[in-house]
């Protein structure tokens, strides 16, 4: 009997998911991860699928496109979503996780699988033979980047993502902080640091004049809106933050009974509830400046920072030119790409791309027909976008209902439209899974 083998480069969210989907279909996997031999910027552990930005996988409800994407992944036996469901922490209407428990679970699951061989070493060249999934992520090493550039024949597009700081609960002044979720939704999942106008103006002035960490001159900064450094956002105008991460809508300061001028929210970062991250505070400020500037936030005057914010490169290919909706290269169909390097944006989207690449690589290994997900599903809509979008200004994309085909009926409310989109998607996905016998690939 012929042994089917697939090489997966990178054990981030996409690579881990791809390896899992392959192994559960009887495919032997060689999974390569350069950590701990070599650490890219922003990574702190050797665990697979380390979350280097937020610990939130965003909205849980299926009326939201990313909530639907997660539910579709559950139907497809996603390892990443299983790990998230097993390690969730309170986060209102979002699915947030204990980041260490989440990554450890994924690592141990893959290490224990008899069909997965783990190689803790850097890959500098794409194998010349065999099926390969490149899931090296937004922090692809320089040597592998050069190799990918050779294979794709395309120049890289790149920008920076920025991670938010994490503080300890016990170091906060809870006389100034209150627990609540906006509009009272879900549990009182967030710590809220209210600011009056004077406090906000002092904080804003310190922020826009703070010293930033240096960036190499040859690297042009192009920020994705979903992970915009807070100081860059602030530089757009004095009130910009009040309509972004510091928006006070839906919150009432119990000390005054009124809506604050601005609010900084902190979200639980671990299962024990001892660590909290500053929501929307991705930053590239120098560490000393972060300590100084963020102490202007009420309640954080003496905060203990267990992790300062960092900024890191995010590299992605021009997928509309290079990839099929199966995530195979058009010119080299034995090579798949998956994760953020394809131009999807977000943890869940990256894992979903890994899921698709894994299923299709298994099909290719078994000489079966490869699959293109229906465009009415979140998976299909996202893959359709990244492989057919205009190449003139191709930008990373989160999943959104704007990518889906229009509904045949007109509904007024956003929530009602989202619910209808989700119900249609899940019904079509269920029928498609049965028709294509995905579990039998």
Swiss-Prot record:
It catalyses: uridine(54) in tRNA + (6R)-5,10-methylene-5,6,7,8-tetrahydrofolate + NADH + H(+) = 5-methyluridine(54) in tRNA + (6S)-5,6,7,8-tetrahydrofolate + NAD(+); uridine(54) in tRNA + (6R)-5,10-methylene-5,6,7,8-tetrahydrofolate + NADPH + H(+) = 5-methyluridine(54) in tRNA + (6S)-5,6,7,8-tetrahydrofolate + NADP(+). Keywords: Cytoplasm, FAD, Flavoprotein, Methyltransferase, NAD, NADP, Transferase, tRNA processing. It holds the Pfam family GIDA. FAD binds at residues 10-15. GO terms for biological process: tRNA methylation; tRNA wobble uridine modification. Its cofactor is FAD. GO terms for cellular component: cytosol. It is found in: Cytoplasm. Its main location: cytoplasm. Its EC number is 2.1.1.74. InterPro entries: FAD/NAD-bd_sf, MnmG-rel, MnmG-rel_CS, MnmG_N, TrmFO. GO terms for molecular function: flavin adenine dinucleotide binding; tRNA (uracil(54)-C5)-methyltransferase activity, 5,10-methylenetetrahydrofolate-dependent. Catalyzes the folate-dependent formation of 5-methyl-uridine at position 54 (M-5-U54) in all tRNAs. Belongs to the MnmG family. TrmFO subfamily. HAMAP family: TrmFO. This is Methylenetetrahydrofolate--tRNA-(uracil-5-)-methyltransferase TrmFO. It comes from Desulforamulus reducens (strain ATCC BAA-1160 / DSM 100696 / MI-1) (Desulfotomaculum reducens).
């Amino acid at each position: 009997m012929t042994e089917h083998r697939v090489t997966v480069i990178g054990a981030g969210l996409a690579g881990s998911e791809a390896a899992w989907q392959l192994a559960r279909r009887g495919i032997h996997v060689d999974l390569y991860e350069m950590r701990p031999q070599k650490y890219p910027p922003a990574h702190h552990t050797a665990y697979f699928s380390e979350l280097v930005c937020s610990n939130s996988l965003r909205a849980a409800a299926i009326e939201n496109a990313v909530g639907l994407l997660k539910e579709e992944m559950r139907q497809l036996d996603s390892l990443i979503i299983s790990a998230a469901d097993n390690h969730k922490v309170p986060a209102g209407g979002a699915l947030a996780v204990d980041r260490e428990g989440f990554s450890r679970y994924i690592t141990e699951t893959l290490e224990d699988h008899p069909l997965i061989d783990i190689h803790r070493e850097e890959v500098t060249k794409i194998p010349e033979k065999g099926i390969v999934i490149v899931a090296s992520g937004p922090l692809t090493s320089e040597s592998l980047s050069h190799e990918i550039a050779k294979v794709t024949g395309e120049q890289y597009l790149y920008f920076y993502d920025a991670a938010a700081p994490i503080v300890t609960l016990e170091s906060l002044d809870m006389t100034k902080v209150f627990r609540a979720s906006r509009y009272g939704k879900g549990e009182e999942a967030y710590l809220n640091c209210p600011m009056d106008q004077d406090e906000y103006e002092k904080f804003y002035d310190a922020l826009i004049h703070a010293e930033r960490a240096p960036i190499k001159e040859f690297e042009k900064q192009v920020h994705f809106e979903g992970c915009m450094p807070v100081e860059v956002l602030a530089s757009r105008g004095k009130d910009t933050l009040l309509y972004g991460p510091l928006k006070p809508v839906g919150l009432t300061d119990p000390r005054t009974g009124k809506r604050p001028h601005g609010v900084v929210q902190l979200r639980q970062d671990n299962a024990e509830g001892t660590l909290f991250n500053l929501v929307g505070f991705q930053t590239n400020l120098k560490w000393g400046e972060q300590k100084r500037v963020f102490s202007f936030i009420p309640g954080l005057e003496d905060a203990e920072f267990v992790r300062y914010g960092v900024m890191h490169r995010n590299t992605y290919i021009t997928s509309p030119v290079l990839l099929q909706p199966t995530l195979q290269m058009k010119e080299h169909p034995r090579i798949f790409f998956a994760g953020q390097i394809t131009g999807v944006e977000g943890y869940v989207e990256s894992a979903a791309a890994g899921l698709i690449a894994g299923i299709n690589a298994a099909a290719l290994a078994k000489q079966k027909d490869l699959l293109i997900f229906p465009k009415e599903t979140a998976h299909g809509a996202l893959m359709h976008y990244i492989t057919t979008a205009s190449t003139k200004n191709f930008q990373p994309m989160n999943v959104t209902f704007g990518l889906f085909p229009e509904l045949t009926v007109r509904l007024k409310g956003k929530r009602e439209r989202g619910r209808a989109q989700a119900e249609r998607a899940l019904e079509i996905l269920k029928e498609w899974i049965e028709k294509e016998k995905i579990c039998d690939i």
